[in-house]
């Protein structure tokens, strides 16, 4: 068996195409959706991620607000930047690029963002709304990467209702939110949330219809621990030095041999990543629409 590819770039292009008409309607009413990013320090991967997000925003005609602060920025200085963006009516979505330098309190920073401008969907208020709402429509921002992973499957005709999904990774950004989204009645999957401390992880993986891994441990998901026909999404990112070139290269959680047993597999990069960025744009547009309806 050779797995079919879950093409994140193609699915992301579909999401962006669906946003074009909504953005045009907002602009016609005098509202241009605006994305603001805050980057602290000079971490090269973070700079790349922020650059790609603004490229997406510019391609769609969104307004861009970039705040690049030095690594020694204090908590008070960072808070002041977030307060300024919260108060700016042209900004509809704010994203603080993480990780932050160790002297800064990431959780306090995320909580300081106006929940209505929470482009990443990670504010405690918005996560709380997700916890409390199992049945109804959710109008608050949703976490981009988990929604992107689910949309990537649904847009490829993968049925999730009644399926056993094993999520590897308990982080707020992906793992915990995935469980909340997948168990909503509109999806109706059964979820096992595992992590690097799970005893006999392989036993859980062998029972899975779908595996979504987001722990950042290179190639920890191996073919020998999966049943034939499983759907596998690789969300984890780790870095390894290439012994030949001396350069750092990106590796996912999923080993190459998994493609021989899976029915579908997401590449990394090129799988969930593009969907994360597309859903970020969607959250910004949704926030602008909420403002326009007031």
Curated annotation (Swiss-Prot):
One of its GO terms (molecular function) is methylenetetrahydrofolate dehydrogenase (NADP+) activity. One of its GO terms (biological process) is L-histidine biosynthetic process. Keywords: Amino-acid biosynthesis, Histidine biosynthesis, Hydrolase, Methionine biosynthesis, Multifunctional enzyme, NADP, One-carbon metabolism, Oxidoreductase, Purine biosynthesis. CDD domains: NAD_bind_m-THF_DH_Cyclohyd. Its EC number is 1.5.1.5, 3.5.4.9. NADP(+) binds at residues 169-171, 196, 237. Coiled coil: none annotated. Belongs to the tetrahydrofolate dehydrogenase/cyclohydrolase family. Catalyzes the oxidation of 5,10-methylenetetrahydrofolate to 5,10-methenyltetrahydrofolate and then the hydrolysis of 5,10-methenyltetrahydrofolate to 10-formyltetrahydrofolate. This is Bifunctional protein FolD. It comes from Renibacterium salmoninarum (strain ATCC 33209 / DSM 20767 / JCM 11484 / NBRC 15589 / NCIMB 2235). The gene is folD.
């Amino acid at each position: 068996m050779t797995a079919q590819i879950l093409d994140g770039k193609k699915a992301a292009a579909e999401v962006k195409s669906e946003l074009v008409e909504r953005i045009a309607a907002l602009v016609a009413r005098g509202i241009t959706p605006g994305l603001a990013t805050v980057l602290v320090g000079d971490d090269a991967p973070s700079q790349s991620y922020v650059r790609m997000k603004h490229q997406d925003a510019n391609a769609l005609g969104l307004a861009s607000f970039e705040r690049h602060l030095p690594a020694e920025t204090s908590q008070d200085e960072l808070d002041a930047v977030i307060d300024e963006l919260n108060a700016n009516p042209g900004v509809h979505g704010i994203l603080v690029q993480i990780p932050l330098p160790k002297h800064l309190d990431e959780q306090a920073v995320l909580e300081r963002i106006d929940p209505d401008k929470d482009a990443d969907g990670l504010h405690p208020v918005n996560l709380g709304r997700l916890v409390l709402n199992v049945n109804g429509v959710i109008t608050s921002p949703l976490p981009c990467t988990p929604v992107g992973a689910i949309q990537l499957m649904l847009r490829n005709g993968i049925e999730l209702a009644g399926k056993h999904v094993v999520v590897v990774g308990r982080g707020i950004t992906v793992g915990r939110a995935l469980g909340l989204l997948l168990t909503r009645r509109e999806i109706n999957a059964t979820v096992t949330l595992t992590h690097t401390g799970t005893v006999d992880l392989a036993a859980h993986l062998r029972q899975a219809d779908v595996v979504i891994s987001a722990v950042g441990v290179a190639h920890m998901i191996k073919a020998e621990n999966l049943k034939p026909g499983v759907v596998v999404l690789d969300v984890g990112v780790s870095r390894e030095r290439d012994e030949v070139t001396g350069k750092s290269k990106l590796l996912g959680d999923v080993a190459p041999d998994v493609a021989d047993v899976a029915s579908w597999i997401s590449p990394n990069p090129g799988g969930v990543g593009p969907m994360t960025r597309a859903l970020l744009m969607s959250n910004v547009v949704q926030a602008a629409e909420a403002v326009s309806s007031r």
